[in-house]
Amino acid sequence: MRGCLQTVRWLTSAWQRPPSYPPLSRAAPCRFFNVSIPRNEQSRKPVSDLERRIAAIPIDRFRNFCIVAHVDHGKSTLSDRLLELTGTIQPGGNKQVLDKLDVERERGITVKAQTCTMLYNYRGEDYLLHLVDTPGHVDFRAEVSRSYASCGGALLLVDASQGVQAQTVANFYLAFAEGLKLVPVINKVDLPSADPVRALDQMANTFELDPKTAVLVSAKTGQNVEQLLPTVVEQIPAPVGVHTKPLRMLLVDSWYSTYKGVILLVRIFDGEVRAGDHVGSLATGLKYHVGEVGIMYPGQTAQSVLRAGQVGYIYFNPAMKRSQEAKVGDTYTKVGSEKLIEPLPGFEEPKSMVFVAAYPVDASDFPHLEDSINQLLLNDRSITLQKESSEALGAGFRLGFLGTLHCSVFEDRLRQEHGASIIITPPTVPFKVIWKDGKEEIITNPALFPEEDALRAKVVELQEPFVLATLTFPEEYLGRVIELCESNRGEQKSLEFFTATQVILKYELPLAQLVDDFFGKLKGSTKGYASLDYEESGWRRSSIAKLQLLVNKVPVDAVSRVVHSSQVQKLGRVWVSKFKEHVDRQMFEVVIQAAVGRNIVARETIKPFRKDVLQKLHAADVTRRRKLLEKQKEGRKKLKAVGNVVIEHKAFQAFLAK
């Protein structure tokens, strides 16, 4: 009993006694945590060998350059070889370090512009090289143009076996307009089909570049690639900037990190930026505290400072949470210096030109689809998003893209990275409606297209977008390509031979025809040897109409499209015959029609199930026979009048599949 009381007494006294920690001396440092980053004088000093080397390099030994080429001419592979030569990555293998997306590696294309910093010792002196790997496809031209603004020169890369292609020409003129110094490079000289002499002649005739300055390489094997770096140092000019001037920082790109918020890829034109600096946006007026600055080497490598002439990344603390605040082309400066600097020339906001509707296969997956789309939009602000609803397919989204490849890449990323099961409608383009009261309206959703009565009474004219397409292909396919363009309502603008066997053909085409698998048809007509590039050519007056699919005279809202009047009959017949294949028979007759307003352009009928009501009758009982048939007929009419056609969800999925 005494032992129990002693135990209780000890426990109660221990509960009242303060913990016996050793007392803190006055000299002991006390650590406090704070969300903001204090300005530390030690951060001004280089803390690593890499920073010491970079700090010792003056701006006249900086080189900012990119690689200009047609899609699939070897830009990313050449980037890997340059990173290996400078010791930025370990040699061996085709890593495609700058292609970070799964879809980029799978398709062999570059979608997002990436940058990497390299240190190169040339004749005993260190040089700081910033390489930007840009997309080659026309759909990602916004990525290309913003990359060029951060560079002083470019390697103009041409495949030795394919020669100059359409996007080589288009990207050359973009780089030329930015005033970049161009260095000709012939790639894939190791291929049996390589013809470097022909490629050099094409570059001389098309771009007026001196073939003697060209470097012949094989990015795959590394042959002759080591000659490129001295060429970059000698021919590409150093950036212009003064690190003692007020900060002028151009936003080139941005992406989203779960832990750091929006990360900005920036080019410093004047001044310098450090962790702890208070900076502001000239476009939005918002102000931020810099959390970290650094370079891509090849991953994010923190630095004490980014100086004039450098390309690097920054993020803020507290973080920038909304990617809409990061406006590409915006100028940032330190708070208090806004009136001391002029904003840098920005970029035009990209305009969506191809629209699709996306619906989940299972309606219960809508929240997951919405979350997946919003996550991808954090890294791609060129996509427009609007919620919409369909009676046939349920809740979904209308998405706007820069082009068909942009749309296809986004769809692949939804499926691969987020496991989304989705139904995508065929791509459509915007149309312009000019009303009699003078107002103009751009319509991106076929469901909002004016009805027939409104068209007659209130609309002055309808317009559709046109593009100027540049096609390059061998001369032997000229007849087929012209026939294809003419059948797609094209208007020829120019025809020239830039070599004895290669043709550059320019046509003005409706964008609606271009997104309707025009490139696939072009590849088929030229056995895969043609290339295509295009640019906007304005709006044209056009005879267009809204084609709808009706099931028992009820419009199917998920299947409607604005098309040219010349395509109405053909597309209507295709629709009704294809839809008939996927609709099950009912207890009553199902009529499938394609219509423009009240005008029916095509029709298919699905016969009902038929019960043999005459099975038990005697052959001679004509009156009873007629009576039963009439009763069955009346029953079908009544069922057709009040019954709803049951169309399975998978029928729409199969109908909308490519």
UniProtKB/Swiss-Prot annotation:
Gene: GUF1
Similarity section: Belongs to the TRAFAC class translation factor GTPase superfamily. Classic translation factor GTPase family. LepA subfamily.
EC identifiers of the protein: 3.6.5.-
GO cellular component terms, semicolon-separated: mitochondrial inner membrane; mitochondrial matrix
Species this chain originates from: Paracoccidioides brasiliensis (strain Pb18)
Gene3D superfamilies to which the protein is assigned, alphabetical: 3.30.70.240, Elongation factor 4, C-terminal domain (3.30.70.2570), Elongation Factor G (Translational Gtpase), domain 3 (3.30.70.870), P-loop containing nucleotide triphosphate hydrolases (3.40.50.300), Translation factors (2.40.30.10)
Record protein name field: Translation factor GUF1, mitochondrial
GO molecular function: GTP binding; GTPase activity; mitochondrial ribosome binding
Binding site residues for GTP: 69-76, 133-137, 187-190
SUPFAM superfamilies: EF-G C-terminal domain-like, P-loop containing nucleoside triphosphate hydrolases
